[in-house]
A protein has these predicted regions:
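Transmembrane beta-strands of outer-membrane beta-barrel pores
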Residues: 39-43, 61, 72-76, 108-112, ...
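Outer-membrane beta-barrel proteins
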Residues: 23, 59-63, 91-98, 127-132, ...
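Residues that define the transmembrane beta-barrel architecture of outer-membrane proteins
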Residues: 31, 47-51, 82-86, 118-122, ...
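Repeated loop/turn-to-beta-strand initiation elements of outer-membrane beta-barrel proteins
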Residues: 31, 63-68, 99-102, 134-138, ...
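Cleavable N-terminal export/targeting peptides
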Residues: 1-30
Length: 243
């Protein structure tokens, strides 16, 4: 009887190690939605209104990842438009291994102030993760795309192009994130038609769902539409909301 009472007392005094070990780990998030919002409205000696909106949605199921992005920028001064640009994209990635995946993407761009009425791109590609650590990630990718575009002067053209891109992300100890993306699009029919897009961003969290984001976007077109300059620069600040 005494041995049984001793075992019972030991069981009651011991911490529930077995129960804790059997608790299931939280399931990874399959769907993620991020919104970027920025707005400026000034009146008085100058009347200026501008807003920028960014949206990114991703859904993951085992090896397949589906993504959708959208961006909008609009600005006006003294009642007249001074900036207008829209971007959208769809992408599907399929992981072949831990660091290699194949993908298919489709993109849309409209920027009347750069002479672009519409620009479409679609094609397959391959992505390779070069660095994957707790704080740093670096990946590169290449794709062969079909491009179709129409200028604001109603000039149409279609061509094949290569797409080369790189993406880097660094997490600081405070969970602040620095990201850098670079994309190079090369026309296979006209060698002088080279386009480079670079975006540098810094995101500082205020809570689990809300953060402040500052980004600097550079778009270079070596062969712009007649009457337009080669380089566009855009600095945006605003709030980022994650769901």
């Amino acid at each position: 009887m005494r041995p049984l009472l001793g075992l019972l007392a030991l069981a009651l005094a011991s911490p529930p190690v077995v129960a804790l070990a059997q608790e299931p780990a939280p399931a990874p998030r399959r769907t993620q939605l991020t919104l970027d919002l920025g707005f400026v409205d000034a009146s008085g000696n100058s009347n200026v209104t501008s807003f920028n909106l960014g949206e990114k949605l991703s859904w993951q199921l085992e090896r397949l990842t589906l993504g959708q992005t959208a961006k909008a920028l609009y600005g006006e001064a003294e009642g007249k438009p001074t900036a207008e640009a829209y971007d959208a994209g769809l992408r599907a990635d399929y992981a072949l291994g831990k660091t290699i995946s194949v993908f298919a993407l489709g993109t849309f761009q409209r920027n009347p102030f750069a002479g672009i009425a519409e620009r479409w791109g679609v094609g397959p590609g391959i992505a390779v993760g070069l660095v994957r650590s707790a704080r740093d990630t670096l990946s590169v990718e290449g794709a062969l795309t079909a491009q179709r575009e129409r200028s604001t002067a109603n000039v149409r053209q279609s061509f094949a192009a290569t797409r080369t891109a790189a993406s880097f992300k660094h997490l600081f100890a405070t969970a602040t994130a620095f990201t850098q993306t670079l994309e190079w699009l090369a026309n296979l029919d006209t060698m002088d038609d080279q386009r480079v897009t670079s975006e540098t961003a810094l995101t500082a969290p205020l809570s689990k769902q809300i953060a402040l984001r500052v980004s600097y976007l550079i778009r270079f077109d070596n062969l712009p539409e007649p009457g337009f300059v080669k380089t566009d620069r855009l600095l945006t600040t605003g709030a980022q909301i994650s769901f």
